[in-house]
Regions:
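Short helix-start
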Residues: 5-10, 28-56
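Polyanion-binding surface elements
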Residues: 1-21
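DNA-binding alpha-helical recognition surfaces that contact promoter or target DNA
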Residues: 20-25, 49
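Alpha-helix C-terminal capping/helix-coil junction sites
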Residues: 26-27, 205
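Short, well-ordered beta-strand micro-motif
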Residues: 43, 232-236, 334
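Core alpha/beta nucleotide-donor-binding catalytic domains of modification enzymes
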Residues: 55-178, 186-190, 195-198, 205
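Class I S-adenosyl-L-methionine
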Residues: 128-136, 146-318
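C-terminal target-recognition/interaction regions appended to catalytic cores
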Residues: 19-20, 281-371
Length: 371
């Protein structure tokens, strides 16, 4: 990818469609393509045809927010701190964070010793404990997507009891912050035929919050060099007079090169750190895969050896023997970079991504240590 040309894959990701659809546009000459070095690219100017991508040509630059005061937040289901850290960068002060996972809490405590980190099942934290945070401005968190039990009726707050969303809503109801922020997987929009999301919005309305039109945000448009989509639900306290608009998108997505090398995103190359090792034979196989390639790039004999019985199964299997490309955003990172179905190999070296490379692609600072 250059600033003037985008790959088929990236255009598909930007438009939330498939490579097949984009290839059909190219084949039908609906959009113009070029083939430098034999690979198909779409000139950036061709993307003016899509209203969804008009921001790529906007003169309004991406602006980082500047808070008018020191807002306080509580972060629920905090994990290792990605969302809380992002809010901190935006000027918010985290006064309490909670997660059930010990390693996640240890990570938060090590990196932010002044934060009040509760390693506890959220359902075991009493209402009384949360009453001590009535001055908090924002409650945020990414509760897991769960189905609700109902018989065709519209659910109220108490009907969601037993789910982690109920716990999120319980805290919001107690503290009554100006804003609540919930992030979740894209699949929540279609979960249980859309009923899960509809009931979540109904409950937020019941406890006193107007939900801004839910939006699926693509990380590549917000200074993150990774193809990751997340659904954001923003609740605004009723009669607060507040208005919310989603931030401007950047005009040029960041790439793996930006994440791992000195340049636009970081002032230094990525520091060395631990990584899993491939077997000797796996290294020999991965040497045949070019940057941005996968098992389809292997010689036929090696394909049969590596793919075995899955060679003739359906599906693209594009995650197998997958090597990241330098000049594209990273694929969505998984918890297992060396697992065969979800491999994320270094663009050049014959190995999975390292811990610090994983962190950089998610825009964690180099001094953020993981337990």
């Amino acid at each position: 990818m250059s600033k003037k040309n985008y790959s088929i894959e990236l255009v598909a990701d930007m438009l939330s469609t498939s490579k097949y659809v984009v290839n059909q546009w190219v084949k039908n000459k609906s959009i113009r393509s070029i083939k430098p070095n034999g690979k198909t690219y779409i000139p950036k100017n061709e993307l003016k045809k899509f209203d969804k991508l008009s921001f790529l040509f906007s003169k309004n630059k991406f602006k980082k927010p500047k808070p008018k005061k020191n807002y306080k937040i509580i972060e629920l289901f905090a994990g290792c701190g990605g969302l809380a850290l992002g809010l901190e960068k935006a000027g918010f002060k985290c006064v309490m964070s909670n997660d059930i996972d010990k390693d996640s809490c240890d990570t938060l405590k090590f990196n932010r010793p002044k934060w009040n980190v509760l390693h506890k099942d959220i359902s075991k934290i009493s209402n009384k404990e949360f009453l001590g945070y009535k001055d908090v401005d924002v409650v945020s968190g990414g509760f897991p997507c769960q189905a609700f039990s109902y018989a065709g009726k519209k659910l109220g707050f108490e009907d969601t009891r037993g789910t982690l969303f109920y716990e999120f809503a319980r805290v919001v109801k107690i503290i009554k912050p100006l804003i609540c922020i919930a992030e979740n997987v894209r699949g929540l929009t279609s979960h249980d035929q859309g009923k899960t999301l509809s009931n979540i919005i109904n409950v937020m309305e019941e406890i006193g919050y107007d939900v801004v039109n839910p939006e699926i945000c693509q990380a590549i448009f917000y200074e993150v060099p990774q193809k990751r989509e997340r659904l954001f639900l923003i609740g605004i306290k009723k009669r607060s007079g507040l208005k919310f608009t989603y931030p401007n998108k950047i005009s040029e997505p960041y790439t793996v090169r930006d994440a791992l090398k000195k340049g636009r995103l970081y002032k230094t190359n990525v520091p060395n750190s631990n990584y899993q090792k491939y077997t000797k034979r796996k290294q020999q196989i991965m040497r045949k895969v070019p940057p941005g390639g996968n098992w389809n790039d292997l010689p036929e004999k090696m394909k049969k050896e590596y793919m075995k019985g899955s060679l003739h199964l359906g599906g693209g299997k594009t995650g197998i023997a997958r090597r990241l490309g330098w000049d594209e955003p990273s694929l969505t990172l998984t918890t297992a970079p060396a697992m065969k179905q979800t491999e994320r190999a270094h663009p050049k070296e014959n190995r999975p991504l390292s811990i610090r490379e994983y962190a950089r692609i998610q825009t964690f600072p180099d001094n953020w240590k993981f337990s």
